[in-house]
């Protein structure tokens, strides 16, 4: 006993030293505190296993509410400071800022990133719901705050689902916390803004409504899910599978899946091509299985070995592990609930684009709600077969795995990441000089800040239409833009294009390496 106590004290000392080092890394310029954080998590876990630490008695529901508010505030801070420090992008934050601004200005869902009707790329009529906010506070910050609040509001839904299934308020609060700690959720939140991710809270509350017998509310939430993006229909098909397999509501499940499939078919076959003037472009990611939705479905049914050979890769295995580990692999014990994730998982795993099967991208929005529900169901089955301590141990493992896999988020709190440096401040001074009505072609980091206008492009796209350019001269020569040249003689600047065209500009403003040009 004395030896265990001595070891516990030694681990306490190590944890204290790591904590001090972590605080130092947060204030040190350009340090990455995530490694120290992982070490601290592992040491505290080992310390708890050796001699359990006292856990204060807290009201589970109040804890969930506080955690929900804290998540919304923390991630609003992270995403806003990332944006202010030029770490957001034209695609997709700038794109959606421009779309919603155009809608709020009476121009309809138009964009110039690329220049087209927005519904010709992705069909997201849910964006109309954000228009009133843009009448009051237009801009990127509005979208980032809405996204953080939306994700946070999924936690109370998880609490209600878990309390109903587990009949344990404490475990329900742990699952709500587990949801908020999920690395996929956090990854989606910091990757600019995407209307598709609103599916996460919408589906979680649809589960709550379905289990409470609130059919009309459930249907409304599913309609909003369908409105988030055309391929969100896959999540609603999955919801239908869950109704049928998990709740034995065969007719309701079949009807839900059938309606969702019809919407997906109509959107990709007729609606989006009508706005685009050509076939639905995103099916190109599945060229190995055919050129249409029907071809892909037939490949799954008729050539399963070919499909398996395509998806049996190391990257996809890592993706599966990264999605399951933060939930303690509990979803594997909830097969009926996990079945709902299959349509969206198929979309991700069959794609030739690796971004779809990366666990921190927005493409997990259609998968994560089902994994969380399946984890709760898996915990309920585990409690029925094993002692309560065993189930709580699995949840504790899931929390540790979530903290480790989310450790990179701690880097966002390092002072150099959120406190603007001299270059960031110079950029904002130059961006303030861009005329509000100017047609602008700018390098990527500037675009999301300047998207409240009809025409904004990512340089050198749109240079023939733009009357202003905004460039970061320290990045010249532009290795990713072969053939695009820049020559300067005093206040005169010439931009040369690969096809021989030359555009002449005058310097409108410059601060450090941030250069604003006005066409002569």
What are these model-derived regions, one by one?
Residues 172-183, 222, 226:
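Short helix- or helix-capping micro-motifs
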Residues 78, 92, 102-103, 249-333, ...:
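Membrane-lumen/periplasm interface segments of specific transmembrane helices
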Residues 157-160, 178, 189, 197-222, ...:
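Specific aromatic-rich, kink-prone transmembrane helix
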């Amino acid at each position: 006993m004395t030896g265990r106590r001595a070891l516990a004290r030694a681990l306490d000392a190590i944890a204290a030293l790591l904590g001090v080092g972590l605080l130092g890394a947060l204030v040190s310029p350009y340090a990455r505190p995530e490694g120290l954080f992982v070490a601290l998590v592992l040491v505290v876990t080992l310390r708890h296993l050796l001699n359990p630490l006292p856990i204060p008695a807290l009201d589970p529901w109040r804890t969930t509410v506080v955690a929900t508010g804290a998540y919304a505030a923390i991630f609003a801070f992270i995403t806003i400071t990332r944006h202010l420090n030029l770490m957001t992008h034209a695609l997709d934050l700038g794109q959606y800022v421009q779309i919603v601004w155009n809608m709020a200005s009476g121009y309809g869902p138009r964009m110039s990133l690329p220049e087209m009707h927005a519904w010709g790329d992705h069909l997201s009529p849910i964006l109309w719901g954000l228009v009133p906010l843009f009448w009051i506070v237009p801009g990127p910050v509005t979208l980032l705050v809405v996204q953080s609040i939306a994700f946070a509001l999924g936690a109370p839904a998880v609490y209600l689902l878990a309390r109903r299934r587990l009949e344990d308020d404490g475990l329900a609060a742990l699952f709500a916390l587990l949801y908020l700690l999920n690395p996929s959720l956090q990854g989606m939140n910091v990757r600019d803004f995407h209307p598709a991710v609103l599916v996460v809270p919408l589906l979680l509350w649809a589960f709550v409504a379905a289990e409470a017998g609130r059919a009309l509310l459930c249907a409304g939430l599913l309609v909003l899910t369908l409105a988030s993006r055309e391929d969100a229909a896959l999540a609603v098909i999955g919801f239908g599978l869950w109704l049928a397999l998990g709740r034995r509501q065969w007719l309701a499940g079949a009807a839900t899946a059938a309606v969702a499939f019809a919407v997906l078919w109509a959107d990709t076959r007729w609606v989006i091509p009508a706005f685009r003037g050509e076939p639905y472009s995103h099916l190109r990611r599945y060229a190995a299985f055919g050129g249409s939705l029907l071809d892909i479905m037939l490949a799954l049914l008729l050539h399963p070995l070919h499909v398996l050979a395509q998806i049996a890769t190391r990257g996809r295995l890592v993706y599966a592990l990264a999605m399951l580990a933060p939930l303690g692999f509990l979803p594997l014990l909830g097969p009926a609930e996990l079945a709902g994730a299959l349509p969206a998982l198929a979309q991700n795993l069959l794609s030739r684009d690796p971004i779809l099967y990366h666990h921190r991208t927005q493409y997990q929005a259609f998968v994560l709600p089902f994994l969380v529900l399946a984890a709760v169901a898996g915990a309920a089955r585990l409690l029925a077969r094993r002692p309560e301590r065993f189930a709580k141990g699995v949840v504790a493992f899931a929390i540790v795995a979530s903290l480790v896999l989310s450790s990179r988020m701690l880097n966002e709190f390092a002072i150099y990441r959120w406190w603007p440096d001299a270059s960031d401040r110079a950029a904002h001074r130059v961006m303030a000089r861009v005329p509000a009505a100017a047609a602008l072609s700018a390098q990527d980091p500037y675009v999301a800040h300047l998207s409240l206008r009809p025409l904004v492009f990512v340089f050198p796209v749109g240079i023939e239409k733009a009357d202003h350019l905004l460039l970061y001269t320290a990045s010249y020569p532009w290795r990713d833009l072969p053939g695009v040249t820049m020559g300067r003689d005093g206040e005169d600047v010439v931009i040369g294009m690969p096809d021989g065209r030359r555009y002449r500009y005058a310097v409108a403003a410059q601060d450090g390496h941030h250069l604003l040009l006005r066409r002569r």
